[in-house]
Every structure is written in structure tokens, then in C-alpha cells.
Amino acid sequence: MTRNEKTEVVAKLESEFKTAEAIVVCDYRGLSVKKLEVLRNSAKEQNVKVQVIKNTLANIALKNSDKVGMELKDTNIYLWSEDQLAVTKVAAKFEESNSDLFKIKTAYIDGEVASVDKVKALSKMPSRDELIAMLLQVWNAPIQNFTIGLNALKEKKEQSA
């Protein structure tokens, strides 16, 4: 890779990292290409970007985008998105199914370096859409129970008449 190509890669990563709400760094050593494709496809469905990046280039891009403090060693694959929950869910779900080969190392969430435990905790939280669905279900429950009661009363009166 020439110096100009490296500069272009760093500039592209820098602009993407600046808009990213969360960046998760994982160890992928030993994963087959087929399994990496599964990861990329599931990430693409959630609008999460996945890329294997050299640590030196990633360090420069992270530093230039004011996301410092992550210790990057060995082979890493980077997942990032503007949606914190989507990134953590994709990484945690893939780690569950490939725990022997894929490990979450560190993350950058909410302007600070996050531990693996925080990433896993975030991955278990419901998404915005799921929260809205839960709220609507709570709002609809009293009305639904009321209509069920009215229907039961109506049927009871019809049977007695």
C-alpha cells in the first residue's frame, strides 16, 4: 500500500469515525472467510460497518477523530455505526455464536473507552423500536381489557335473554 493510499484510507476512516456513536474492536483470529461474510451480512442489515484495518492506520484515524485511549494490539476487526445498540448487538451476537474464535476486545462508546462488560450490557438493551412497541403495549392493555370485559358482558346478557 503506497503512502497516498494510506492517507486516503486514514482520511476516509477519520470521517466515518467522527460520525460514529460507537466503535467496537474485536479479535477475529482463526475465523474463516465464510464466517466473516456472515458477520458482514448481519452488520450490513443493521447499518453497521465492518472492516479489518491495520492498527497503525486505525490509531491515526481514531486520534484524528478525537477518539483516543483504546489499546490496539494483534489482529483486529472494527465495527462502527451511528447507532450504539446496533453495533453492540451485532458484535455480542456474533461473539455468542463464535465464542472460540471471535472476542470483543474494547470499544469506544459515549465519548469514552468502554469495557467488554459494558458492550455486552448495552447489547442486551432493547432498541428504540422495541421500547416504543413495549410502551404501546402498556398503553393499549387497559383499553383492550376494557373491550374484552364489555364483550363478555354483552355475550352474558345475550345468553340470559
From Swiss-Prot:
Q: Which cysteines are joined by disulfide bonds?
A: none
Keywords assigned: Ribonucleoprotein, Ribosomal protein, RNA-binding, rRNA-binding
Q: Which PROSITE patterns match?
A: RIBOSOMAL_L10
GO BP annotations listed: translation
InterPro entries registered for this protein in UniProt: Ribosomal_uL10 (IPR001790), Ribosomal_uL10-like_sf (IPR043141), Ribosomal_uL10_bac (IPR022973), Ribosomal_uL10_bac_type (IPR047865), Ribosomal_uL10_CS_bac (IPR002363)
What is one GO cellular-component annotation here?
large ribosomal subunit
Q: Write down the superkingdom of origin.
A: Bacteria
Q: What is this protein's name?
A: Large ribosomal subunit protein uL10
Name of the gene:
rplJ
